[in-house]
Amino acid sequence: MKSSATKFFTLLFFALLITAAIPSSAQAKPIIKFGIEHVYLHNAGEAEIVGYFENTGDQGAYVKWTEIDLTIIADNGQQMWADSGIRHYVDDIYVPAGTYVAYTFYIQNPDIPEYHGKYRNRWHSNTHWEKAAG
C-alpha cells in the first residue's frame, strides 16, 4: 500500500511539474475587428462608413488602423463602385475587452457615386491594434 501511494504522489508531482513548465496556449490577448453597419452615399466622391470596433478577446487594446475591401452594389445587381486595401488610420481608440466601440469615418474617391436609391455592400476588414497607446 505504501508503494502505490508513493507511485501516485510521484506521478502527481511530475504531472504538476509538466503542467507548470508548458505555457498555456490560451493566453490573454485582444481580438479586435471592425464591422460595418451602414454605408451612406450622400455626396459624390465620398462614402460615409458607420461601424464599430468589436473586441472579443479578454484584454483591452488600442486600435491603430483598419484596412477595408468595399464593394457597393445597386439594387439591380450592378456593381457601382469597389476598392480594396483602403487603409484608415485611427487615433488610438481604446476598445475594452468584450465590448463594442462605435466609429464613423469617410472614404473619399472621385469614382464614388452620389446615390439615394437602394443598394447593398460587401466588405472585409483587417484591423491592427497594439496594447499601448501612441
Question: PLM features: residue spans?
Answer:
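Bacterial N-terminal signal peptides that target proteins for export
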Residues: 2-12
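Bacterial N-terminal signal peptides
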Residues: 10-20
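Low-complexity, acidic Ser/Thr/Pro/Gly-rich terminal tails and inter-domain linkers that flank the onset
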Residues: 26-46, 52, 133-134
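Hydrophobic core residues within well-ordered beta-strands of beta-rich domains
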Residues: 47-49, 66, 101
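Asparagine-centered strand-capping/turn motif at beta-strand->loop junctions
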Residues: 53-58
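Intrinsically disordered, low-complexity Pro/Gly/Ser/Thr-rich segments with frequent PxxP/GP/PP motifs
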Residues: 80-113
